[in-house]
Curated annotation (Swiss-Prot):
InterPro entries: GTP-CH-I_C/QueF, NADPH_dep_7-cyano-7-deazaG_red, QueF, QueF_type1. This is NADPH-dependent 7-cyano-7-deazaguanine reductase. Catalyzes the NADPH-dependent reduction of 7-cyano-7-deazaguanine (preQ0) to 7-aminomethyl-7-deazaguanine (preQ1). The gene is queF. GO terms for molecular function: preQ1 synthase activity. The lineage of its organism: Bacteria, Bacillati, Bacillota, Bacilli, Lactobacillales. Pathway: tRNA modification; tRNA-queuosine biosynthesis.
Length: 163
């Protein structure tokens, strides 16, 4: 498949008009074919400027979000991911729900072999919340990998003063 064919379904990348959506919007996510589906490899996104709203107070919440996955046939297009995460800006939800929803939306889009999403939210009221979501494709080695990474994901927590 040529690069031009591969990118024909990408509507956001290279667009002169970037549609910034201010409400939760999973339909903005786009994918492209993984040319290296014969390899297991990680793709990692570091998203240090995530914002959402507290569903009770309406106050802004800030986080760094780390998304890592082992693709199968599809990869997420990074500009669409940026716009998708931006769509949470005026979305009111708890930290745990945001991270789980992001993970589930990406699993639905990509059907990856493995995926994890880790949110590191800045403290509010003196407490920081760091929800972690992961997924391993059922009945494969990735299901076992997900279980092991879930059990061990935070064995060496960082100092709290890093935020």
């Amino acid at each position: 498949m040529s690069q031009q064919e591969e990118m024909k379904n990408l509507t956001l990348l290279g667009s002169k008009e970037t549609p910034y959506i201010f409400e939760y919007s999973p339909q903005v996510l786009e994918s492209f074919d993984n040319r290296h589906a014969d390899n297991d490899y990680f793709i990692k996104f570091n998203c240090p400027e995530f914002t959402s709203l507290c569903p009770i107070t309406g106050q802004p919440d800030f986080a760094s979000i780390y998304i890592s996955y082992i693709p199968d046939q599809l990869c997420v297009e990074s500009k669409s991911l940026k716009l998708y995460l931006f769509s949470y800006r005026n979305h009111g939800d708890f930290h745990e729900n945001c991270i789980n929803t992001i993970g589930k939306d990406l699993v639905e889009l990509l059907n990856p072999r493995y995926l994890e999403v880790w949110g590191k939210f800045t403290p509010r009221g003196g407490i920081s919340i760091d929800p972690y979501y992961n997924y391993g494709r059922p009945k494969t080695k990735y299901e076992n990998m997900a279980e092991q990474r879930l059990f061990n994901h935070d064995l060496y927590p960082e100092n709290i003063d890093n935020r």
